[in-house]
Amino acid sequence: MNTKYSYGKVYQVVGPVVDVVFEKQDDLPKIYDCLIIDEPNMKLHLEVAQLIGDDIARCIAMGPTEGLARNVKVTSTNQPISVPVGTEVLGRMFNVIGEPIDEKKPIDASVKRMSIHRPAPSFADQSNELEIFETGIKVIDLLIPYAKGGKIGLFGGAGVGKTVLVQELIHNIATGHGGLSVFAGVGERTREGNDLYYEMIEGGVIDKTALVFGQMNEPPGARMRVALTGLTMAEYFRDVNNQDVLLFIDNIFRFTQAGSEVSALLGRMPSAVGYQPTLAEEMGSLQERITSTKSGSITSVQAIYVPADDLTDPAPSTTFTHLDAKTVLDRNIASLGIFPAVNPLDSTSRLLDPSVVGIQHYQTARKVQMILQKFLELQDIIAILGIDELSEEDKLTVSRARKIRNFLSQPFFVAEKFSGNKGKYVPISETIKGFSEIVEGKHDDLPEQAFFYVGSIDEAIERAKTLTRNG
């Protein structure tokens, strides 16, 4: 690793963009190199974004630039931003440059560090085996099974439950699989990160997780790079420790948004809807590194904010192309009080294939989707004429669809204190058994309320008995 330092000075400051001038052309840093300002009242990291002429490096600040003056000395490290990796990062919380922000002891200087800018694994190194990743969440395991080492997107507008679903997945992975997780909080609320940290301590899963945050209030440079910081930590567990690791990114839209801000600050001509012209390339450079290799896997779950609930917006639609499974959260389902508010018809997974999940799982999932699709088509008739005008067959379809819709709801462990319902982890075998019995008509006599917020089908049967007793 090159540790030769060179020195320049601040030439111009325009918000988070800092121009640094170097006297010697040989001292000029490379693109992505890290520059450091270390003054008594300010410690700031910069990343080189452009080289102007023979002597100026235009940089993006990774922290606030208030109080920065011209002619301040700048040290060029002649290497990209590097962050700590390995088991020492577990149970800790970091910022974009790998500094601990949890007020615990500093990271030891002997801990290995890796550059956040790394090439994606070569095609020869990648693994193409398909394996189901059990989450314990019924609607996901049945209709949109996740792939081990795959990329999963959680699409939804504001307030439909993306972050809660991510937190539940972290809980279930840590308790059910004992797996390692890396959580990258990209441009989201500080309060949510704080809550997540203390919930993980309470749930006993913090020792299996590394947390990296670049919140909403931070400059665009930090929000643009924090996903790479988290990914670098995950890559070390995969490539060096040969482990399977989960990478949670909340929210990938903020990564795009920060890139758009930086692009505008650098004076690039905007593209569609005001986004940066390099949108697809930036997204690809992140997503191509998230993959399974022959040594281990990174399974990534990415919450994706959808601006104005418009899935055709360039930010979510660019992300679509990289995903194995799309989990769409729907405001209409949330308004019915059904959580997780996953839309079972809009959500898709390339793993829902009989050769991967098996014939019984595939047929049950398809029957569930057919019943729900028929129910959707009948909604207008019911709204205009009433349910009594339907044929007996259609009435039965509506009854089963409502039971399925209710049975797709599930109490979450991380929402126990809000809902008062004890969280449930449902194995795939129980999920398939429950839904296959509903579509076969074995529970046509049970009231639909019995299926609301239960785990397995046996709980629904018990709930029905209780409802009958209470009249």
UniProtKB/Swiss-Prot annotation:
InterPro entries (alphabetical): AAA+_ATPase, ATP-synt_VA_C, ATP_synth_F1_bsu, ATPase_a/bsu_AS, ATPase_alpha/beta_chains, ATPase_F1/V1/A1_a/bsu_N, ATPase_F1/V1/A1_a/bsu_N_sf, ATPase_F1/V1/A1_a/bsu_nucl-bd
Magnesium found in the keyword field: no
Keywords: ATP synthesis, ATP-binding, Cell membrane, CF(1), Hydrogen ion transport, Ion transport, Membrane, Nucleotide-binding, Translocase, Transport
Main localisation: membrane
UniProt keyword Ion transport, yes or no: yes
Subcellular location: Cell membrane
Top enzyme class: translocase
Domain of life: Bacteria
Subunit structure: F-type ATPases have 2 components, CF(1) - the catalytic core - and CF(0) - the membrane proton channel. CF(1) has five subunits: alpha(3), beta(3), gamma(1), delta(1), epsilon(1). CF(0) has three main subunits: a(1), b(2) and c(9-12). The alpha and beta chains form an alternating ring which encloses part of the gamma chain. CF(1) is attached to CF(0) by a central stalk formed by the gamma and epsilon chains, while a peripheral stalk is formed by the delta and b chains.
Protein purpose: Produces ATP from ADP in the presence of a proton gradient across the membrane. The catalytic sites are hosted primarily by the beta subunits.
Name the UniProt record assigns to this protein: ATP synthase subunit beta
Organism: Mycoplasmoides gallisepticum (strain R(low / passage 15 / clone 2))
